[in-house]
């Protein structure tokens, strides 16, 4: 199947023939659907806290930040291109009409002066067309405006990543999501030394642009928020790219005979996450940001999630030290079992069959894992995966964040669980990545390699099958201890299309 050139290509990518064969086998056979016990809901896998508990957890987090013993990092996947944000505007450029016709097009032009990038776009139009946006619209030359927004002769927004686009207007400036993440991180993720660590994963071609922006705004942000920024970057590793298969199941070959590899999706970022030397990691998508006047809820509930995390971690560490000592009673084992099955929602029907030594070993294995606390938002029809109680390969049940592709929607019972789920995943995580002895967990050890999905694509008119790795907060964290906590919808304000920026949540006060 592979010749010497192939093996040389594998070596350069940091992979090998066995891995590639295994990936081709996965593409051929597909992935099994996950067995579900139920959708998670408040009281069944999702914790809802009251105001008094909220205050306690926030105090817990503030104390953790100020004790000077811990490092905190925010991790933001930021490599995605913004092209999908402008899908409707690209379609307008290709349309056989020249004035706004669809609801989307009309909304865009009706609100054009409200976009944070309006001044830049107007300047680009005057430079390239010798006319302002107002004049171009008066001439019904709408497509020139869109071309200057999306194309390389103008702002080039159609080719830039979301993190570098101007999202929000302020009195004397405008901010990108990159800058908004810097601003909000100073409000909940700085230690007692005032340092804010933020790590962005970016694509290689955009790294210099992100670096330039970080260098240009760090000083003013430090002055404004009273913090020092330590901003770092990494790329998705080439070794995490996955092989593409031709229609007959053999490796898809490029015109030059080389084998085609494709990025394996955001699940590959578990490798980048694994390289962070930190105790606690906040994870959030690049486009879920709001202006300063709306950040209160974001900060409050980030602190809540983090407070829950360090509270849980403290108990886990105490239990692990006790189990190591061997000085536990039957009553104490019962207490720890209750914590694992009820608080961590990790259940097994076989526990009654274990003697005390076996039970202690089982509990130790379940407790000594990375921990994540995930915010969950009440379902209001927004897109996103959902929280479930799912069966694992060892027969246990645990909390998982699942996408529709992981669920057999032909099974009416499972389809109902998915469609009638009360909550969805807004990608709002706080993670503890060191064990009770202070050593960093090797995160790839906790990936469920039997998850992922196959998608059909094409290249140069030829069909291919692509392999997506388990998603970062899906299968890549499958074997973590997980707690779901209800957070309000106000903490979830993603920008999926350019017109989302016209929502009140992205407009000035």
Regions found by a protein language model. Name each.
Residues 182-186, 411-414, 469:
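Short amphipathic beta-strand starts and helix->beta connectors
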Residues 36, 185-192, 418-420, 474-475:
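Short, flexible, solvent-exposed loop/turn segments with mixed acidic/basic and small polar residues
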């Amino acid at each position: 199947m592979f010749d010497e050139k192939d093996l040389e290509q594998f070596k350069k990518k940091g992979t090998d023939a066995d891995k590639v064969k295994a990936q081709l086998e996965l593409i051929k056979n597909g992935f099994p659907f996950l067995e579900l016990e139920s959708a998670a809901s408040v009281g069944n896998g999702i914790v809802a806290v009251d105001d008094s508990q909220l205050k306690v957890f926030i105090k817990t987090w503030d104390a953790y930040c100020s004790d000077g013993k811990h490092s905190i990092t925010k991790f933001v996947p930021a490599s995605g291109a913004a092209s999908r944000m402008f899908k409707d505007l690209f379609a307008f450029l290709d349309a056989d009409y020249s004035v706004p016709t669809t609801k989307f097009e009309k909304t865009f032009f009706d609100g054009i002066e409200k976009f944070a990038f309006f001044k830049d776009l107007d300047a680009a139009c005057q430079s390239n067309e010798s006319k302002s946006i107002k004049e171009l619209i008066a001439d019904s030359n709408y497509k020139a405006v869109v071309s200057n927004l999306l194309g390389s002769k103008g702002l080039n927004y159609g080719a830039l990543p979301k993190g570098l686009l101007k999202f929000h207007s302020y009195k004397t400036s405008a901010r990108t999501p990159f800058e908004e993440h810097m601003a909000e991180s100073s409000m909940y993720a700085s230690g007692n030394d005032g340092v804010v660590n933020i790590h962005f994963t970016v694509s290689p071609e955009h790294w210099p642009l992100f670096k330039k922006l970080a260098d240009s705004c760090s000083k003013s942000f430090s002055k404004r928020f009273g913090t020092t920024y330590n901003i770092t970057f990494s790329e998705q590793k080439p070794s995490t790219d996955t092989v593409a298969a031709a229609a007959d199941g053999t490796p898809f070959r490029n015109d030059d005979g080389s084998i085609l590899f494709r990025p394996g999706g955001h699940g590959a970022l578990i490798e980048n996450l694994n390289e962070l030397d930190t105790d606690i990691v906040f994870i959030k998508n690049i486009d879920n940001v709001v202006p300063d006047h709306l950040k209160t809820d974001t900060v409050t509930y980030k602190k809540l999630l983090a407070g829950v995390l360090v509270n849980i971690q403290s108990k886990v560490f105490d239990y692990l030290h006790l189990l190591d000592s061997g000085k536990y009673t039957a009553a104490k084992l019962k207490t720890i079992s209750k914590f694992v099955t009820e608080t961590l929602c990790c259940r097994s029907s076989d526990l009654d069959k274990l003697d005390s030594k076996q039970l202690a070993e089982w509990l130790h294995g379940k407790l000594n894992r990375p921990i994540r606390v995930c915010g969950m938002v009440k379902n209001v029809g927004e897109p996103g995966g959902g929280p479930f109680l799912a069966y694992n390969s060892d027969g246990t049940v645990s909390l998982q964040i699942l996408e529709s592709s992981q669920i057999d929607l032909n099974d009416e019972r499972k389809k109902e669980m998915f469609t009638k789920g009360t909550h969805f995943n807004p990608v709002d995580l706080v993670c503890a990545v060191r064990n009770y002895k202070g050593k960093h967990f090797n995160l790839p050890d906790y990936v469920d390699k039997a998850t992922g999905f196959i998608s059909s694509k094409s290249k140069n008119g030829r069909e291919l099958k692509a392999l997506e790795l388990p998603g970062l907060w899906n299968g890549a964290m499958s074997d973590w201890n997980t707690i779901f906590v209800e957070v309000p919808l106000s903490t979830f304000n993603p920008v999926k299309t350019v017109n989302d920026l016209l929502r009140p949540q992205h407009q000035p006060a």
